Amino acid sequence: STGKMAALTAVPTEDYFPVFGIEAEKVEDSVFYIAENPSSSADEAAIFKAVDETYAKTLERIFKARIQAQAQLAQSYSIEQYDKIKSTQIKRNGCYVYYVVSESGAELTEMLDSGIAGIIAQG
């Protein structure tokens, strides 16, 4: 594995909140990136801060469903992309929900674990 991440592009919230069924007023902050060429790479990354832990749990469910759907899609065209998606962990810490789909997904997610824990600790 090269460990490289595909070139990512930021997606405006209005383009995907309705698609995912995300309630904008319940999200304090968010970033969502997908591969510039989604037909060749399933790489994506998301960090969301919900207004409360209850909605964070809802976001966690939404993203788990997305990852499952992406995996099913990839299964038909690329075992490599499928494996990458299947190994993705959706993480929740307090009001934060985040994940990274990448060959380096595990390492990048660990970095987010400690970064977000630090933000929460600062309160």
Features from the language model and the residues they span:
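Extracellular, surface-exposed passenger/stalk and repeat segments of large secreted bacterial proteins
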Residues: 1, 12, 58, 118-121
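Sec/Tat-exported extracytoplasmic proteins
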Residues: 2-3, 63, 67-71, 101, ...
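Subset-of-secretome marker
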Residues: 2-13, 68, 106
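Short, compositionally biased low-complexity segments enriched in polar/charged residues
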Residues: 6-42, 54, 85
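Stable alpha-helical elements in mature extracytoplasmic
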Residues: 12, 16, 55, 59-63, ...
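A short, solvent-exposed beta-edge/loop patch
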Residues: 37, 49, 80-121
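Mature extracytoplasmic domains of secretory-pathway proteins
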Residues: 37-68
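Short Gly/Thr-rich strand-loop-strand
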Residues: 56-92, 122-123
